[in-house]
């Protein structure tokens, strides 16, 4: 049996339960809409400035917050582009920042704070 280079679902669930990060990859050869990339993922309940700093330093891409439609509507987010022409059709909203408890909005602390505030079901 060929050994996989990928973690099992069970292993990823254990990582999430331990407040850990994992890399979620897609495969362009399976779907033409895929970007053939990996994303660092962590639970919003676990994210802290150290995680944000790690993402910014090592992944060097956008730091995004995945959110369901109900929560995004609840906090008043709208799509950045109502007619999405991108290949992946990713539903990006405008950039956000917490109203309170942040300074410039760009620091790892401010970004982690914004994620915590935006993902709070009582927001």
Predicted regions located by residue number:
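Catalytic domains of riboflavin
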Residues: 1-123
């Amino acid at each position: 049996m060929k050994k996989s280079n990928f973690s099992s679902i069970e292993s990823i669930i254990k990582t999430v339960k331990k407040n850990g990060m994992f890399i979620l990859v897609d495969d362009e050869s399976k779907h033409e809409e895929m970007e053939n990339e990996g994303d660092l993922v962590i639970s919003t309940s676990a994210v802290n400035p150290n995680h944000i700093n790690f993402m910014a330093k090592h992944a060097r891409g956008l730091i995004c917050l995945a959110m369901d439609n109900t929560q995004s509507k609840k906090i008043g987010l709208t799509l950045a582009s109502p007619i999405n022409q991108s290949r992946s059709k990713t539903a990006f909203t405008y950039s956000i920042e917490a109203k309170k408890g942040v300074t410039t909005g760009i620091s790892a602390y401010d970004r982690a704070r914004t994620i915590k505030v935006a993902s709070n079901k009582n927001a």
